[in-house]
Amino acid sequence: MNVLQGLLLGLIQGLTEFLPISSTAHLTLAGKWMGVVSAEHPEHWTAFIAVIQLGTMAAVLIYFARDVLDISLTFLEENVFRRMRFKDQSHVSKLGWYVILGSLPVATFGLVFKKVIEGSLTKSLIVISASLIVFGILLGVSEVVARFSKSIKRISWLDALVVGFAQVMALVPGASRSGTTITAGLFMGMTRETAARFSFLLSIPAVMASGLLEFRESLDFMGSQDFLVLASATLMSAVSGYLTIAFLLRFLRRHSTNVFVVYRVVLGGALLWMVFRHGVV
Protein backbone atom coordinates (compact mmCIF):
# COMPACT_ATOMS: atom_id res chain seq x y z
CA MET A 1 0.00 0.00 0.00
CA ASN A 2 1.35 3.44 -0.89
CA VAL A 3 0.66 6.84 0.67
CA LEU A 4 -1.89 7.85 -1.97
CA GLN A 5 -3.87 4.67 -1.35
CA GLY A 6 -3.61 5.28 2.38
CA LEU A 7 -4.96 8.82 2.01
CA LEU A 8 -7.89 7.57 -0.07
CA LEU A 9 -8.71 4.86 2.46
CA GLY A 10 -8.43 7.40 5.29
CA LEU A 11 -10.87 9.66 3.45
CA ILE A 12 -13.30 6.77 3.02
CA GLN A 13 -12.95 5.87 6.70
CA GLY A 14 -13.71 9.41 7.84
CA LEU A 15 -16.67 9.85 5.49
CA THR A 16 -18.30 6.51 6.32
CA GLU A 17 -17.47 5.91 10.00
CA PHE A 18 -20.23 8.14 11.34
CA LEU A 19 -22.79 7.73 8.58
CA PRO A 20 -24.91 4.59 9.20
CA ILE A 21 -23.59 2.87 6.07
CA SER A 22 -20.62 0.85 7.44
CA SER A 23 -17.07 2.11 7.12
CA THR A 24 -15.75 -1.46 7.24
CA ALA A 25 -17.83 -2.42 4.21
CA HIS A 26 -16.63 0.55 2.17
CA LEU A 27 -13.01 0.18 3.26
CA THR A 28 -12.97 -3.54 2.46
CA LEU A 29 -14.55 -2.92 -0.94
CA ALA A 30 -11.99 -0.22 -1.69
CA GLY A 31 -9.17 -2.35 -0.32
CA LYS A 32 -10.14 -5.33 -2.47
CA TRP A 33 -10.39 -3.07 -5.51
CA MET A 34 -6.89 -1.69 -4.79
CA GLY A 35 -5.55 -5.18 -4.15
CA VAL A 36 -4.27 -4.38 -0.65
CA VAL A 37 -6.37 -6.91 1.31
CA SER A 38 -4.19 -9.98 1.83
CA ALA A 39 -5.95 -13.35 1.69
CA GLU A 40 -2.97 -14.91 3.50
CA HIS A 41 -2.92 -12.35 6.31
CA PRO A 42 -6.44 -10.91 6.75
CA GLU A 43 -5.48 -9.84 10.28
CA HIS A 44 -3.21 -7.18 8.75
CA TRP A 45 -6.22 -5.54 7.10
CA THR A 46 -8.21 -5.74 10.34
CA ALA A 47 -5.34 -4.03 12.14
CA PHE A 48 -5.12 -1.28 9.50
CA ILE A 49 -8.85 -0.52 9.82
CA ALA A 50 -8.73 -0.49 13.62
CA VAL A 51 -5.71 1.82 13.76
CA ILE A 52 -6.99 4.43 11.30
CA GLN A 53 -10.19 4.52 13.35
CA LEU A 54 -8.07 6.31 15.95
CA GLY A 55 -8.25 9.24 13.56
CA THR A 56 -12.03 9.27 13.60
CA MET A 57 -11.93 8.84 17.37
CA ALA A 58 -9.78 11.98 17.52
CA ALA A 59 -12.46 13.71 15.46
CA VAL A 60 -15.06 12.75 18.08
CA LEU A 61 -12.85 13.99 20.93
CA ILE A 62 -12.27 17.32 19.19
CA TYR A 63 -15.86 17.86 18.08
CA PHE A 64 -17.30 16.88 21.47
CA ALA A 65 -14.39 18.26 23.51
CA ARG A 66 -16.63 20.36 25.72
CA ASP A 67 -19.03 17.46 26.34
CA VAL A 68 -16.22 14.99 27.04
CA LEU A 69 -14.52 17.40 29.45
CA ASP A 70 -17.80 18.20 31.20
CA ILE A 71 -18.71 14.52 31.56
CA SER A 72 -15.23 13.59 32.82
CA LEU A 73 -14.95 16.38 35.39
CA THR A 74 -18.52 16.00 36.65
CA PHE A 75 -18.13 12.21 36.86
CA LEU A 76 -14.96 12.57 38.94
CA GLU A 77 -16.48 15.22 41.19
CA GLU A 78 -19.70 13.35 41.95
CA ASN A 79 -18.26 9.83 42.15
CA VAL A 80 -14.73 10.25 43.49
CA PHE A 81 -14.67 13.47 45.50
CA ARG A 82 -18.27 13.87 46.69
CA ARG A 83 -19.20 10.19 46.45
CA MET A 84 -22.82 10.89 45.68
CA ARG A 85 -25.37 8.12 45.33
CA PHE A 86 -26.21 7.33 41.73
CA LYS A 87 -29.81 8.51 42.01
CA ASP A 88 -28.65 11.89 43.32
CA GLN A 89 -26.11 12.49 40.56
CA SER A 90 -26.63 14.92 37.69
CA HIS A 91 -27.55 13.65 34.25
CA VAL A 92 -24.03 14.57 33.12
CA SER A 93 -22.39 12.22 35.61
CA LYS A 94 -24.95 9.53 34.85
CA LEU A 95 -24.11 9.88 31.17
CA GLY A 96 -20.54 8.94 32.06
CA TRP A 97 -21.82 5.78 33.74
CA TYR A 98 -23.99 5.01 30.71
CA VAL A 99 -21.00 5.28 28.36
CA ILE A 100 -19.09 2.85 30.59
CA LEU A 101 -22.06 0.47 30.82
CA GLY A 102 -22.68 0.62 27.08
CA SER A 103 -19.02 -0.16 26.36
CA LEU A 104 -18.87 -3.40 28.37
CA PRO A 105 -20.69 -5.68 25.88
CA VAL A 106 -18.49 -4.84 22.87
CA ALA A 107 -15.33 -5.06 24.98
CA THR A 108 -16.30 -8.54 26.15
CA PHE A 109 -17.42 -9.89 22.79
CA GLY A 110 -14.53 -8.21 20.97
CA LEU A 111 -11.95 -9.99 23.10
CA VAL A 112 -13.73 -13.36 23.07
CA PHE A 113 -14.22 -13.40 19.29
CA LYS A 114 -11.01 -11.56 18.34
CA LYS A 115 -9.71 -14.39 16.12
CA VAL A 116 -13.01 -14.64 14.24
CA ILE A 117 -13.11 -10.87 13.71
CA GLU A 118 -9.57 -10.92 12.31
CA GLY A 119 -10.26 -13.93 10.07
CA SER A 120 -11.15 -14.15 6.40
CA LEU A 121 -14.88 -14.68 7.08
CA THR A 122 -15.27 -11.05 8.08
CA LYS A 123 -13.80 -9.95 4.74
CA SER A 124 -16.40 -11.91 2.74
CA LEU A 125 -18.53 -9.80 0.38
CA ILE A 126 -21.47 -12.14 1.04
CA VAL A 127 -21.33 -11.35 4.77
CA ILE A 128 -20.86 -7.64 4.10
CA SER A 129 -23.69 -7.38 1.57
CA ALA A 130 -26.12 -9.38 3.74
CA SER A 131 -25.30 -7.16 6.73
CA LEU A 132 -25.81 -4.00 4.69
CA ILE A 133 -29.29 -5.16 3.69
CA VAL A 134 -30.47 -6.69 7.00
CA PHE A 135 -29.29 -3.87 9.25
CA GLY A 136 -30.42 -1.30 6.70
CA ILE A 137 -33.94 -2.70 6.89
CA LEU A 138 -33.79 -2.62 10.70
CA LEU A 139 -32.80 1.05 10.53
CA GLY A 140 -35.82 1.67 8.30
CA VAL A 141 -38.12 -0.14 10.74
CA SER A 142 -36.78 1.94 13.63
CA GLU A 143 -37.74 5.10 11.74
CA VAL A 144 -41.32 3.82 11.52
CA VAL A 145 -41.76 2.82 15.18
CA ALA A 146 -39.61 5.49 16.86
CA ARG A 147 -41.24 8.08 19.12
CA PHE A 148 -38.38 10.62 18.81
CA SER A 149 -39.14 11.95 22.29
CA LYS A 150 -36.09 11.16 24.42
CA SER A 151 -33.34 13.77 24.80
CA ILE A 152 -29.78 13.11 25.99
CA LYS A 153 -30.86 14.11 29.53
CA ARG A 154 -33.46 11.33 29.66
CA ILE A 155 -31.25 8.40 28.68
CA SER A 156 -31.50 5.52 31.18
CA TRP A 157 -29.32 2.54 32.08
CA LEU A 158 -31.61 0.33 29.99
CA ASP A 159 -31.09 2.58 26.96
CA ALA A 160 -27.33 2.39 27.47
CA LEU A 161 -27.38 -1.40 27.77
CA VAL A 162 -29.55 -1.90 24.68
CA VAL A 163 -27.42 0.46 22.59
CA GLY A 164 -24.30 -1.19 24.01
CA PHE A 165 -25.41 -4.65 22.87
CA ALA A 166 -26.34 -3.15 19.50
CA GLN A 167 -22.73 -1.99 19.24
CA VAL A 168 -21.70 -5.65 19.50
CA MET A 169 -23.54 -6.30 16.23
CA ALA A 170 -21.17 -3.85 14.57
CA LEU A 171 -18.45 -6.49 14.91
CA VAL A 172 -20.17 -8.05 11.90
CA PRO A 173 -18.71 -6.30 8.82
CA GLY A 174 -21.31 -4.30 6.95
CA ALA A 175 -23.48 -3.76 10.02
CA SER A 176 -22.05 -0.29 10.82
CA ARG A 177 -21.26 0.73 14.39
CA SER A 178 -23.07 4.04 14.07
CA GLY A 179 -25.87 2.31 12.17
CA THR A 180 -26.58 -0.35 14.79
CA THR A 181 -26.32 2.04 17.73
CA ILE A 182 -28.45 4.76 16.12
CA THR A 183 -31.02 2.11 15.20
CA ALA A 184 -31.13 0.88 18.80
CA GLY A 185 -31.41 4.45 20.06
CA LEU A 186 -34.38 5.11 17.80
CA PHE A 187 -36.05 1.88 18.93
CA MET A 188 -35.61 3.12 22.52
CA GLY A 189 -37.42 6.37 21.71
CA MET A 190 -34.49 8.75 21.33
CA THR A 191 -34.56 11.66 18.93
CA ARG A 192 -32.34 11.16 15.89
CA GLU A 193 -29.80 13.71 17.10
CA THR A 194 -29.73 12.19 20.60
CA ALA A 195 -29.22 8.70 19.18
CA ALA A 196 -26.35 9.96 17.04
CA ARG A 197 -24.69 11.94 19.86
CA PHE A 198 -24.85 9.01 22.26
CA SER A 199 -23.57 6.72 19.51
CA PHE A 200 -20.56 8.97 18.94
CA LEU A 201 -19.77 9.28 22.67
CA LEU A 202 -20.10 5.51 23.04
CA SER A 203 -17.59 5.01 20.23
CA ILE A 204 -14.73 6.60 22.18
CA PRO A 205 -13.85 3.73 24.59
CA ALA A 206 -14.45 0.97 22.02
CA VAL A 207 -12.52 2.57 19.17
CA MET A 208 -9.67 3.72 21.41
CA ALA A 209 -9.24 0.27 22.97
CA SER A 210 -9.37 -1.67 19.69
CA GLY A 211 -7.21 0.86 17.85
CA LEU A 212 -4.44 0.92 20.46
CA LEU A 213 -4.51 -2.88 20.84
CA GLU A 214 -4.25 -3.45 17.09
CA PHE A 215 -1.55 -0.78 16.78
CA ARG A 216 0.52 -2.55 19.42
CA GLU A 217 0.15 -5.88 17.63
CA SER A 218 0.79 -4.35 14.19
CA LEU A 219 4.28 -3.29 15.31
CA ASP A 220 5.32 -6.90 14.73
CA PHE A 221 4.73 -6.77 10.97
CA MET A 222 4.89 -3.11 9.89
CA GLY A 223 7.88 -1.47 8.25
CA SER A 224 8.85 2.23 8.07
CA GLN A 225 6.86 2.75 4.84
CA ASP A 226 3.82 1.19 6.49
CA PHE A 227 4.01 3.70 9.34
CA LEU A 228 4.01 6.61 6.89
CA VAL A 229 0.97 5.18 5.10
CA LEU A 230 -0.78 4.53 8.40
CA ALA A 231 -0.07 8.03 9.71
CA SER A 232 -1.34 9.62 6.49
CA ALA A 233 -4.52 7.54 6.51
CA THR A 234 -5.17 8.26 10.19
CA LEU A 235 -4.74 12.02 9.75
CA MET A 236 -7.04 12.04 6.73
CA SER A 237 -9.68 10.04 8.61
CA ALA A 238 -9.57 12.58 11.46
CA VAL A 239 -10.17 15.57 9.18
CA SER A 240 -12.89 13.96 7.08
CA GLY A 241 -14.44 12.39 10.18
CA TYR A 242 -14.80 15.77 11.91
CA LEU A 243 -16.58 17.23 8.88
CA THR A 244 -18.85 14.18 8.67
CA ILE A 245 -19.92 14.49 12.32
CA ALA A 246 -20.86 18.12 11.80
CA PHE A 247 -22.80 17.25 8.65
CA LEU A 248 -24.70 14.30 10.13
CA LEU A 249 -25.85 16.09 13.28
CA ARG A 250 -27.20 18.98 11.19
CA PHE A 251 -28.80 16.55 8.75
CA LEU A 252 -30.59 14.53 11.44
CA ARG A 253 -32.19 17.64 12.95
CA ARG A 254 -34.34 17.98 9.83
CA HIS A 255 -34.24 14.67 8.00
CA SER A 256 -34.79 10.97 8.60
CA THR A 257 -32.23 8.23 7.99
CA ASN A 258 -34.25 6.79 5.09
CA VAL A 259 -31.73 7.93 2.49
CA PHE A 260 -29.13 5.74 4.23
CA VAL A 261 -31.58 2.84 4.38
CA VAL A 262 -32.10 2.98 0.61
CA TYR A 263 -28.36 3.33 -0.01
CA ARG A 264 -27.54 0.30 2.16
CA VAL A 265 -30.15 -1.94 0.54
CA VAL A 266 -29.16 -0.92 -3.00
CA LEU A 267 -25.43 -1.34 -2.31
CA GLY A 268 -25.98 -4.68 -0.57
CA GLY A 269 -28.15 -5.92 -3.42
CA ALA A 270 -25.57 -4.83 -6.00
CA LEU A 271 -22.81 -6.64 -4.13
CA LEU A 272 -24.85 -9.84 -3.90
CA TRP A 273 -25.50 -9.65 -7.64
CA MET A 274 -21.76 -9.25 -8.28
CA VAL A 275 -20.97 -12.21 -6.03
CA PHE A 276 -23.46 -14.64 -7.55
CA ARG A 277 -23.37 -13.36 -11.14
CA HIS A 278 -19.65 -12.81 -11.56
CA GLY A 279 -18.16 -14.78 -8.68
CA VAL A 280 -16.62 -11.72 -7.03
CA VAL A 281 -15.55 -12.49 -3.46
From Swiss-Prot:
GO CC field: plasma membrane
The reaction(s) this protein catalyses: di-trans,octa-cis-undecaprenyl diphosphate + H2O = di-trans,octa-cis-undecaprenyl phosphate + phosphate + H(+)
Transmembrane portions of the chain: 1-21, 45-65, 93-113, 125-145, 155-175, 195-215, 227-247, 256-276
Keywords tagged on the record: Antibiotic resistance, Cell inner membrane, Cell membrane, Cell shape, Cell wall biogenesis/degradation, Hydrolase, Membrane, Peptidoglycan synthesis, Transmembrane, Transmembrane helix
Membrane protein topology class: Multi-pass membrane protein
Primary location group: membrane
Localization per record: Cell inner membrane
A GO term, aspect molecular function: undecaprenyl-diphosphatase activity
A Pfam family that the UniProt record links to this protein: BacA
Superkingdom: Bacteria
Biological processes, Gene Ontology terms: cell wall organization; peptidoglycan biosynthetic process; regulation of cell shape; response to antibiotic
EC annotation from Swiss-Prot or TrEMBL: 3.6.1.27
Note: Bacitracin is thought to be involved in the inhibition of peptidoglycan synthesis by sequestering undecaprenyl diphosphate, thereby reducing the pool of lipid carrier available.
Role played: Catalyzes the dephosphorylation of undecaprenyl diphosphate (UPP). Confers resistance to bacitracin.
Family: Belongs to the UppP family.
Listed name of the protein: Undecaprenyl-diphosphatase
Organism this protein belongs to: Syntrophobacter fumaroxidans (strain DSM 10017 / MPOB)
High-level lineage: Bacteria, Pseudomonadati, Thermodesulfobacteriota, Syntrophobacteria, Syntrophobacterales
The gene coding this protein: uppP
